[in-house]
Amino acid sequence: ANKPYHGKSKAGYYGDFVIETDAMVGKVMNALNMHGFADNTLVVFTADNGAETHAFERLEEFKQWSSGKYRGVKRDVYEGGHRVPFIVKWPGKIKQGSVSDEVVSQVDFAATFAKIINYPLGKKEAIDSYNLLPVFEGKKYSKPLRVATVQNTSPKKFALRQGDWVLIDLSLIHI
């Protein structure tokens, strides 16, 4: 967290960072409103990975766990390492307060944004990206959007998720 936010949360550096992030997102949202863009702007709030390993110290000291109930940390194949918030606001397109159980990936931004701007993706562009507009619109699929999701954050660690199951290091666990 930057200096003006140090000590604001009484929950250490991470708590201060959360307060600063909230303030900065608020500034962006206020600017969109002030300039008349809020009703025609897609806003995505997400993260790139789960908690860092020093999060265990934070858990002990402040009784907070940013990965919630999920096992694992950044650069890990377990859910806590890569399951992150994915909050999308798009007035008139996405129903406020809606929630989806669909497994999505940030690589899906490419196909989604291409669809929004009517950009025809070539055969070699965004080959593993899916258009999320139906998910945003609250449509339910008869089968999952993607057959499986591969997670790897280091050369020798891979996980393969399909539905509620994850194959990790040749061990199958139910999540």
What are these regions (language model features)?
Residues 16, 22, 39, 48, ...:
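Acidic side chains
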Residues 51-77, 93-98, 102, 107-173:
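C-terminal cap/loop subdomain of S1 sulfatases and analogous C-terminal strand-loop tails that border
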Residues 4-13, 30-93:
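Histidine-centered active-site microenvironments of extracellular/periplasmic hydrolases
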Residues 23-30:
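Core alpha-helical elements of the protein kinase catalytic domain
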Residues 13-19, 103:
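Catalytic nucleophile-loop/oxyanion-hole region of alpha/beta-hydrolase
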Residues 28, 174-175:
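Aromatic/hydrophobic pocket-lining residues that form π-stacking "cages" and hydrophobic walls in ligand
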Residues 1, 18, 25, 42-47, ...:
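Beta-strand elements within well-structured catalytic alpha/beta cores of enzymes
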